[in-house]
Amino acid sequence: MAKFPEAEARIFNKLICMKCNARNPPDATKCRKCGYKGLRPKAREPRGG
């Protein structure tokens, strides 16, 4: 998706909270906003249509 690897790492190297959708750093264990422990990696492929 990104044009070069550095940009791809900057864009996709994040975790997303599954409760409040906040962006979190890649080494987080819980959400910075709500404290929820359910974090997923940011999707590299677009979903839906």
Curated annotation (Swiss-Prot):
Cystine crosslinks: none
UniProt GO MF annotations: structural constituent of ribosome
GO CC list: ribonucleoprotein complex; ribosome
InterPro entries: Ribosomal_eL40_arc, Ribosomal_eL40_dom, Ribosomal_eL40_sf, Ribosomal_zn-bd
SMART domains: Ribosomal_L40e (SM01377)
GO biological process: translation
Entry keyword annotation includes Ribonucleoprotein: yes
Domain of life: Archaea
Transmembrane is among the record's keywords: no
Keywords noted in UniProt: Ribonucleoprotein, Ribosomal protein
Gene3D superfamilies membership: 4.10.1060.50
NCBIfam families assigned to the protein according to its UniProt record, in alphabetical order: PRK04136.1
Similarity comment text for this entry: Belongs to the eukaryotic ribosomal protein eL40 family.
Protein name: Large ribosomal subunit protein eL40
Organism: Methanopyrus kandleri (strain AV19 / DSM 6324 / JCM 9639 / NBRC 100938)
